[in-house]
């Protein structure tokens, strides 16, 4: 991996930075597997909270899934239960989240230890096979094996039992999680059916959905880790005509971010349709929302953009 990319992904983003509260991570273990177990004791996936964990989230807590920056999410976790973060909470005292919040929390913990890590937006094959469901995971640099590893910190023993998940979610096979660019490539080449990619229970699927995920993955690779329902810029709707050449180019850039790192950074920072604005449209709430990050940190991120 190029040193510029190594340094970039080892440093915090505006979304992953705890800012003045980093001491709360001091008691945490070092390895990704142990950190994933910690995270599983801090968060609960709202959609399955009742059926999987016996906890019915009250209406006044449902907005927790919209907390984007880790600093806000950890603050909420400590409001629900003030014990140190390594202490496992019962489900009713865990913060509500979705796949992106589990992934970003692991990214934050690893970056805090100087480990290169990044959120990846794509599609997982282990929730509803043979479908590829919209999903986010953490990708971190394993210095010993000198390779990027995919980790899904959301999947605990409850998920494993309920969905009969047998793969190693601490070192995900690349066949079982496709980053958005790879999903796009397979759909475009005819290797995969575009109707297999999306959110099955919501009836959202198709190449337009893959294109939107590709924009979110591009943003995440530029350390703007957004929510799955955040919409901005060039993300298409289901009835929009797709610019195939444009998204083919994005897929090529994101397929090997280390090799394309300088161009990936330049392209993102120079394209208003790709770059995350100060406010985005939240497709779940139906309104525009400020993304809630420190502009100073965003400017510091831009300093990493190659000349």
Regions found by a protein language model. Name each.
Residues 2-15, 36-45, 51-59, 123-136, ...:
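His-Asp-centered catalytic microenvironments across diverse enzyme cores
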Residues 2-93, 105, 301-304:
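Secondary-structure boundary elements
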Residues 28, 92-99, 207, 214:
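Aromatic-acidic/polar surface patches that form glycan- and anion
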């Amino acid at each position: 991996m190029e040193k510029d990319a190594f340094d970039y992904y080892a440093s915090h983003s505006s979304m992953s930075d705890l800012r003045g509260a980093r001491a709360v991570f001091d008691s945490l273990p070092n390895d990704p597997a142990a950190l994933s177990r910690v995270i599983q004791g801090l968060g609960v996936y709202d959609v399955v909270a009742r059926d999987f964990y016996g906890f019915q989230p009250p209406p006044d807590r449902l907005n927790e899934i919209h907390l984007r920056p880790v600093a806000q999410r950890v603050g909420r976790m400590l409001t629900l239960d003030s014990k140190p973060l390594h202490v496992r909470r019962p489900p009713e005292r865990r913060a509500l989240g979705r796949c992106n919040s589990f992934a970003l929390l692991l990214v934050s913990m690893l970056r805090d230890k100087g480990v290169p890590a990044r959120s990846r937006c794509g599609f997982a094959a282990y929730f509803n096979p043979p479908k590829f469901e919209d999903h986010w995971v953490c990708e971190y640099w394993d210095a010993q094996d000198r390779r990027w590893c995919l980790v899904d910190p959301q999947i605990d023993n409850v998920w494993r039992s309920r969905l009969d998940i047998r793969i190693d979610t601490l070192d995900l096979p690349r066949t079982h999680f496709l980053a958005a660019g790879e999903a796009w490539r397979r759909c475009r080449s005819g290797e995969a059916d575009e109707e297999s990619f999306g959110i099955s229970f919501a009836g959202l699927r198709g190449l337009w959905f893959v294109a939107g995920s590709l924009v979110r993955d591009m943003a995440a690779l530029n350390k703007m880790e957004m929510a799955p329902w955040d919409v901005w810029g060039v993300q298409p709707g289901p009835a929009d005509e797709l610019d195939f050449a444009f998204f083919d180019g994005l897929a090529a850039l994101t397929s090997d971010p280390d090799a394309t790192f300088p161009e990936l950074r330049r392209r993102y920072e120079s394209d208003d349709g790709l770059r995350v604005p100060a406010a985005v449209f939240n497709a779940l709430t139906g309104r525009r929302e400020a993304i809630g990050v420190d502009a100073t940190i965003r400017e510091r991120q831009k300093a990493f953009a190659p000349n």
